[in-house]
Regions:
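Short, structured segments at the rim of ligand-binding sites
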Residues: 1-171
C-alpha cells in the first residue's frame, strides 16, 4: 500500500506503470485522477494489465507480461482548452470535433462566466466568443476536476482583455 501525501500526476502514473509488472497486489491511495491517468489505465488494461479504481484508490494486480496492443490515445484537454480560450479571446467562433467535453467541463463553465456562448453535444464543442469579455474575481486552479493549472497562463491573457479586475490563484 502506497499513500501519496499529496495529489501528484507523475508519481501516480509512474507507480501504476511499475506496479503492472510487480509481483502481487499494489494499492495506491490518494491518487491523482486526471483523465490522462484514466486513459493510461485503459491502455495498460488493453495490454493485459489488471488495474481497477474506486475513487482516488487504484488497485493493481501484477502480471508477468504485457501484450502488444493497438490503442487510440485520448485528445489533449489542455490543447482543447487553449483553443477554447483563444476563441473567447478573439471573439470568434470555434467548433471542436471528436472531443469529450466532459473532461473540460469546469473550464467551459468558467469561459461561460467570461461571456462565451458554449454548446457541447456528444463529441463536439461549439464556442462563440463574447463581444465584451467579463471579468472574474477569485479564480483558483485546483487538481482535476478543478480548473487546470496548465491553462492558467492562457486564462491570464484572457483576463487582461476583460473589462474590470480579475484574479487567479495557483493552488
Amino acid at each position: 500500500i502506497i499513500k501519496f501525501p499529496r495529489l501528484t500526476v507523475g508519481a501516480t502514473e509512474n507507480s501504476i506503470i511499475a506496479a503492472c509488472l510487480a509481483k502481487g497486489k499494489t494499492i495506491l491511495k490518494n491518487c491523482a485522477i486526471e483523465p490522462e491517468i484514466k486513459d493510461l489505465t485503459k491502455f495498460l488494461n488493453s495490454a493485459g494489465a489488471k488495474i481497477s479504481w474506486i475513487g482516488r484508490t487504484c488497485k493493481i494486480n501484477g502480471v508477468k507480461t504485457l501484450n502488444p496492443t493497438e490503442y487510440s490515445v485520448m485528445a489533449d484537454r489542455i490543447e482543447a482548452g487553449t483553443f477554447c480560450v483563444a476563441a473567447t479571446l478573439a471573439k470568434g467562433n470555434l467548433k471542436i470535433s471528436n472531443f469529450d467535453a466532459k473532461i473540460i467541463k469546469t473550464e467551459l463553465q468558467l469561459l461561460k462566466r467570461f461571456g462565451a456562448k458554449i454548446k457541447a453535444h456528444k463529441e463536439k464543442i461549439f464556442i462563440k466568443g463574447p463581444q465584451k469579455i467579463r471579468s472574474i474575481k477569485n479564480i483558483k486552479t485546483k487538481e482535476y476536476p478543478g480548473v487546470a493549472t496548465d491553462l492558467q497562463s492562457q486564462l491570464m491573457v484572457l483576463m487582461c482583455k476583460a473589462s474590470g479586475k480579475s484574479s487567479i490563484t495557483e493552488n
